[in-house]
Each structure stands twice: as structure tokens, then as C-alpha cells.
Amino acid sequence: MAAAALAKTLGRECAIRLIESEEIGTVGVGESTVPHLEAFNRALGIDEAEFVRQVRGTFKLGIEFVDWGRLGDRYFHTFGPIGHDYGFLPFHQYWLKLFLSGKAEDIGAYSLHSVAAQRGKFMTSATDVPQNSPLYYVAHAYQFDAGLYARYLRSYSEARGVERTEGRVVDVKLRGTDGFIEAVVLEGGETTSGDLFIDCSGFRGLLIEQALHTGYDDWTHWLPCDRAMAVPSEKVGPATPYTRSTARAAGWQWRIPLQHRTGNGYVYSSKYISDDEVHRTLMSNLDGHALAEPRILKFTTGRRRKFWNRNCVAIGLASGFMEPLEATSIYLIQSGIGRLINLMPDRNFSPVLIDRYNKQAAFEFERIRDFLILHYFATERRDTPFWQYCGTMQIPEQLADNIRLFRDSGRFFRDADEMFALPSWVQVMMGQRFVPTRYHPAVDLVPEQEVVELVASVRNVIARCVEVMPTHEQFIARFCPAEAA
């Protein structure tokens, strides 16, 4: 992704060299994303239908969460708006007045994305509707084979002048004067020098940590899962336009449908459950037969103390790790690339640019961290030691403030460029039974019948829109079917 974006932005004015090794494996079981990736691909000039075909992808309206608030609960966290603002207040405040008195359905009934996901419907947009129609543009993301996407972008990059070298980096040479990276040495002895080095070496942090000793902030006390067991399985039935996250005894299980198979995994805390028990649970909860042996990935949730150190910028897993609960992994890669392009240095490497990059990246990681913690903390589950810990742990103060504000009267304020906006917080809080005790007092200034009609009209418009949408499978079959394997 970094090579493709830099090649598109800088053209052939800068020499870009990509060093990677096919011998270093990846956990290729399917990747779930957020809508920002559509903009990234569009900036590269990639056709959406062609992209989905090449990566054997499906479309995503959001995530279904099962058993998180209580055993038996399920709700959707989707990408689109909830209703529409009325006056100066968000829709959910009017809905909340009726909901608290038993006169409205769950919040998902007022989200086009949620209703469409439940019914297996999908479309990207409609050309014959007014701009205020929910169908004018349907925010969406993708579910795809990450390995195929990487190969697709590799070809894209090489076609635009990126020089690819197959090999492993075995040594890093630092300048004696300032400790900047001068060159990397490959297995065969070849040396590659450069001005700026981007570390995409994953958890190892080959440059940012092993060479520059940047340091790492461990967040395991808030997000205790430290392993994932992943396995692909055969496709059974229509692919859903959403990812599923099912809470388990010591973590959660993902299900990501692709056109040709399904990606599955159990993210868990090794402190509370054994690998053998995870294996039994995962393998007994697959839709179809496993297509490979499960693989275990070990990780420590957290981030580098600096994302940009000297002349090295860490991108992706080299910069930090967030479990894939809200599918933020590729987003964080994309965001890091965009930030680097905006703050691209000259050979002087101004400390002002580096400092701003690090501050913005730290803010982004910490706000996403808090949103993930919310899922574990906002629960009534106490049925296992894992959930007993999560439901009673000390949480970051800003998250605690957000929860108190929402539970008081359903309010939330987004900070600056924080990734997750009001609809996300409303859906997760309500979905996991953190219900406000009251609504905004200004709602009472609107006649109750007007509130009833507003809420009902949103529900009715969504129902009519979903009715005319094709099924997810029909949409893929018409516009972007992958070639048979």
C-alpha cells in the first residue's frame, strides 16, 4: 500500500525500492475493512468492480456483534447514518425519547445499513433517486483476501516505477553522526542505501525497533487478548454483506465471508484459556469444512513510542497492533501513509514534521484503543473470569468520561479527527445495553406527535429502500464476480 501510494503521488521523481520476501508468511484468512479504503483505491485510480473481482472480495455494511452485552444478544455496528438530524439535534435523541417509553424499536431499525445487512441486501448507489435518498450513496467497505490485494498493489507499484527486490534484510547500518539509517543489508550481501526508510516488517519492527530501539507501549491491561487462531473454511450459503464478531469465553470469534471461502479466527487471552480449548471452540463453530490447519498469531496490543524515529517511519504492524475487532488494521496503514505524504520531508528531516506526525498518530491509536475497550467494558457478562475482568477493569479516563456523558443523556462529542463518530458510539453503547437515563431536554420542545411522525417516517423510508435493493449475491454476480478458482 505504501509503495503504491508513494508511486502515485511522487511519480518517478523519487526512486522507490520495495524489499520483501516470499519466504515470510502471512495469515491469509480474509481481511475486513472500513469505508476509508474505497477512497484510497479511488485515489490510486483503481476501478472498484475490477478490484473486488481480483481480490475475490465481498462488500461490507458493518459488523454483527453476537453475545457481547449478554449471551443471546445481537446488534449491528454499521457504517451509515442513523436516521437524519432534525433541527439542531441528532436523530437518536428524538428516537431515545420514544424508546425510553417503549414506543420505538431498537436503534438498528432506523439504520438503512443495519436493516439491509439483516436481510442480505446490498448496493453501492442508485442513479435515479434524489440526493437526499438513503440510496444515493451507500457507505460500504470490503471483505477480501489480503494476500491477493498485496499482489495486486505490487503489480500496480511496479508498473509505476517501483523497483522490487526479493530478499531478507539481515543488517541495518546507522550513520555515526546522527544515528540515522544509512543502508540495509540483504541476505546475499547486497546493500541498499536511501534517504527515507519505511518499516513495514510487521511485529518484528526490523528498523524501528531492532535497529533504532524506539520502545513500545503495552496496552494488554486494557485489551487482554494476546493471541489469535485463524483458519479458512469452505463457503456455505450466500456471502453476507457484513463481518460477524461472536463473543466467546475468553475473547471473540470473527467470520469474514469472501466470494470463494470464509475467513475465521478466535482472538483470545492466553491467560484465561488454553490453545487446545480455543482450537476446539473455533473448529466446532465453522460454517463449512476447514481448508487448512489453524495457525496461531501471537501479539502484544499497543504502539511504538514513536512512529517516526529519525529517518524511519513505521507503517502497519511495525507501528503497533490493534486487534481486528473493528477492522482498523488496513485503515491504520492507509492513515499512516496519508499522514506521511502530507508531512513528506526533504533531506533535512525537519523535527517539526516528525513531531506532528507522531502526535497525530498517537492520538489516532489512542482513540481507536478506547473504542475497542468500550466493547469489552460495556457488558453485563460475568460468566467467565475473562469477562469478569473486562467488565470491572479500570479504563482510560477519557473513555470513562465519554461513557458517563452518554449514559447520562445520550450525548457524545467527537475529538478532532477521531476515527469513530457519533453513530458508531450510539450503536455500540445501545447494542451493549449502556442505555441513557434520559434524552436531550430540547426534544420536549417539539410536539410529541411530530417526534412520533419523524421516527416513523425514517423507519418507513428505510423499509421501502431496502425492499428495492438487490441481494448481496445478486449485486456481486452482476458487477464483480471473481473468476473460478
Q: Where in the sequence are the language-model features?
A:
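Extreme N-terminal leader/targeting segments of oxidoreductases
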Residues: 4-15, 134, 147-151, 476-485
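Predominantly flavin-linked oxidoreductase catalytic cores and closely associated redox partners
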Residues: 5, 130-282, 337
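Glycine-rich FAD pyrophosphate-binding loop
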Residues: 5-31
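Dinucleotide-binding Rossmann-like beta1-alpha1 core, especially the glycine-rich loop
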Residues: 29-118
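Alpha-helix-centered segments that form part of catalytic cores
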Residues: 105-144
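Conserved FAD/dinucleotide-binding core of flavoprotein oxidoreductases
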Residues: 248-300, 318-332, 343-347
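Long, low-complexity C-terminal extensions of enzymes
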Residues: 342-485
